[in-house]
């Protein structure tokens, strides 16, 4: 991107929260290859920022994201472009779970196809009551093969298949019922509520948040016995940490903890 180009992704700080905004309103914040590359760079920057404890991901304009840029796809009909685009998308989506800090999606308008994939890939997600979600690729002869990866790992099989096979829009209340998002708020309340959640998380130990997120995602693919063995070792490691000793002492003495690793 040259100095004259508009940033497709912007980054602002609000205390210990990094606000990451998809900034391509003219395309409904479509996940073009360039936007995905910028998003990955900003996510890495925020992950490495020791003053950031939580990331909030949102979009400008009329919607969160309408998914991949179909005009760009239509203009680049070759395997190399398809692979580069989808690999850039995979890089972002997998990094969201590998990232050491919690990521919250603040969703409005629409989140469709790869935009819905992005919501499903975040740790938490909140939407306003006007938001609509879909994996509508089937309607244009292009099944949502890559979006289904996090969607099917976030919501139940029958709900996933219903979204994928019908391609219909669902409202925010239905998305909450499916488990795609955590809660629904009125449009004028959404950002305030998301920041309340973010700041509550910020009050916790950075060390514990990082360790807990890592444990959660690593154990998901393990067999039950293996998961318990892994989680037991992580619990022992956590119990020996300075912040655990501080937190337990604060609880027992009825005072607020003073985290050492925050």
Question: What do the predicted segments below correspond to?
Answer:
Residues 20, 24, 39, 57, ...:
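Terminal peptide-recognition signature
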Residues 1-60, 94:
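Conserved CoA-thioester-binding segment of acyl-CoA-metabolizing enzymes
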Residues 81, 88, 92, 147-150, ...:
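Hydrophobic alpha-helical segments typical of transmembrane helices
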Residues 42, 88-100:
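Catalytic-core regions built around general acid/base machinery
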Residues 1-15, 49, 167-173, 192, ...:
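C-terminal alpha-helix plus adjacent terminal tail
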Residues 37, 51, 59-92, 111, ...:
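Glycine- (often His-adjacent) and acidic-residue-rich active-site loop
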Residues 95-207, 241, 246-249, 255:
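Crotonase-fold acyl-CoA enzyme core
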């Amino acid at each position: 991107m040259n100095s004259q180009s508009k940033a497709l992704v912007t980054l602002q700080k609000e205390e210990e929260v990094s606000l990451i905004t998809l900034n391509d309103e003219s395309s409904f914040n479509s996940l073009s290859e360039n936007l995905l590359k910028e998003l990955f760079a900003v996510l890495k920057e925020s992950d490495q920022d020791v003053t950031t404890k939580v990331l909030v991901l949102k979009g400008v304009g009329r919607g969160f994201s309408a998914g991949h840029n179909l005009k760009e796809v239509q203009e680049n009909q070759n395997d190399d472009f398809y692979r580069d685009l989808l690999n850039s998308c995979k890089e972002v989506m997998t990094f969201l779970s590998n990232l050491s800090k919690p990521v919250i999606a603040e969703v409005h308008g629409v989140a469709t196809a790869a935009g819905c994939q992005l919501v499903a890939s975040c740790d938490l997600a909140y939407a306003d009551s006007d938001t609509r979600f879909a994996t509508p690729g089937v309607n244009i002869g292009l099944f949502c093969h890559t979006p289904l990866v996090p969607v099917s790992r976030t919501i139940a099989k029958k709900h996933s298949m219903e979204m994928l096979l019908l391609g219909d829009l669902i409202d925010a209340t239905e998305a909450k019922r499916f488990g795609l998002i955590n809660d629904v708020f009125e449009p004028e309340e959404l950002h305030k509520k998301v920041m309340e959640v973010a700041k509550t998380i910020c009050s916790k130990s950075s060390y514990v948040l990082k360790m807990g997120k890592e444990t959660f995602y690593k154990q998901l693919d393990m067999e039950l016995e293996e998961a318990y063995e892994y989680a037991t070792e992580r619990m022992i490691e956590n119990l020996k940490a300075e912040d655990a000793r501080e937190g337990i002492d604060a609880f027992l003495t009825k005072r607020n903890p003073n985290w050492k690793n925050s």
